Amino acid sequence: MQLQAITHIPLSKDAYMVNENTIVIRLKVGKGDIKSSDVYYGDRVCMSEPILVKRVSMKKIASDELFDYFEGKIKSEYTRVCYYFHIKDIEGKETYYSEYGFSEKMTCCRTQYFQFPYLHRNDMICIPKWTENMVMYHIFPDSFAEKKNYISGRRKVIQIENGLTSESKNGGTLRGILENLDYIEELNVNCLYLNPIFKAASYHKYDTIDYMEIDPCFGTKQDLKDLVNECHKRGIRVILDGVFNHCGSGFLPFLDVLKNGEKSEYCNWFYKLNFPVVYDTIPNYEAFAYVKEMPKLNTGNQEVIDYFCKVGRYWIREADIDGWRLDVANEINHDFWRAFKKAVKEEKDDIFLIGEIWEDSTIWLMGDQFDSTMNYTFSYICREFFAKKIISVSQFDQKIHRMNLRYPEMVTRAQMNFLDTHDVSRFFSDCAGDDRKLRLAVLYMMCAVGIPSVFYGDECGITGITESEYRKTMQWGCEDSLIEFYQKCIKIRKNSKALCTGTYETLICEDKDEIYGFARKTKEETIVVIMNMGEKEQKITIPGAKHQWLDVFSDEKQDGNQIVCKGMSGIILKKI
């Protein structure tokens, strides 16, 4: 038995509350080493000694290249729980595992067990219910539309206060988005995420000058209100981009620092100022990515925290927005985010918060800061497997399972999955012109665990490697089968409880034939997805599923013993 591979961390993704009387317990063990694992639990403050314990059998739920993962659910009548594991390996050897370590015989001393001190209602991670069937459409406002089915691609510059200007590169506006809601609605998405729209100097608007005003290149507050109101009438939610890690060099507090130096009342609003502060090519103050136009805010300062809590509340109250995507979230103080979440939740209790974090986000996703983060890992895996085909089917499966187990289940379901964004090259550019690769990736994204997000124009086959290319103007007038494919996949996703909230189980993982199949299940529904990554047509048997299935694309019935899947294509099947 590989004792060194066995891991459990209490009060983490390995032990978390689902509701007031249910705890999910996970155990990581060496791959192929353990035959079974049970978790024994009891009342940690029971008046008798030894305490009565109950057994819950654990199930192996996933594997990666190094480990197997077991999971069990404790449905406890106790509010204070202690627990330990009884583990058997494939050779019949047994061990007990507790806070105290490993032993051949389990101690009766409850203080040496793993502890879940108290099942507090407020410690549950609660994700807004409306996000369960959410499919997001991500719009870069400058590049999308000026009016219905049109964007000029022409630059414009508008004079604003303090001798500053605001720039638009392609001419997109909020009114243009509003006039194209029919198109957006026909895609079947039910949420819009807009990159920054507040007053700023640059075309991308990540250098905010005024957090309480809409950028004049994009329109007015009334335009935003009209857009959100019309979206809500159509059942579409709206998420705005909040850039609170840094501001633009034209932000009034920073201008005051430039003017008044150490006497400025805003000195403590910024990081590492060297006086006299010089606005030059190489800034003598902390800035985002060393860019002088983006001085870093001191988000540990209470005045700064209070100001941005006010900003967060203001746009909920003013425009009835439904969420915030929070830029450079991992460079901002945790106390800032705790205060921000408390403030915006008081304003609207089902507001949805997404942090821009490119790596493991565990510390931000414990329930006190964000509901979700941008899942760049998902994009990396999909590029390797679908676009570039540089990892095998089994490697893909291992990476997906490891990704899905980074967080508690409800948090994983709320992760923002995407193939590309405004910060990376277009996914289709990695596909070498083969739209079958894109279609397979889209099909998988719509069936995977997590919230799917489509970057504007992906449904039209937009490509782009450099920033100016992947942020190019929307390709209006593009009517082809790729758009229809997106529409169908999104509709299937939204209408399936299993795809939105179900478990994820690998069914087929064949490197030689390049076949991957998995199931998404709830008590009421089972969906099986089969993907053929090879060029040859394959006849596939669904393991243990001899009943009838419905191909949700063709509406044709299929026999589970012989599913025909063409080369470089996928099938979504519903159990009937």
Say what each PLM segment does.
Residues M1-V135, F140, G153-R154, N162-G163, ...:
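Carbohydrate-interacting/catalytic domains
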Residues M134, F140-N190, I197-E318, F340-E346, ...:
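Substrate-binding/active-site clefts of carbohydrate-active enzymes
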Residues V135-Y137, L192-L194, V238-L240, W324, ...:
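Hydrophobic faces of well-ordered beta-strands that scaffold small-molecule active sites
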Residues N195, I214, D327, G457:
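Conserved residues at the C-terminal ends of beta-strands
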Residues V228-I236, H246, F251-G261, R317, ...:
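Active-site-proximal helices and loops of the catalytic beta/alpha 8
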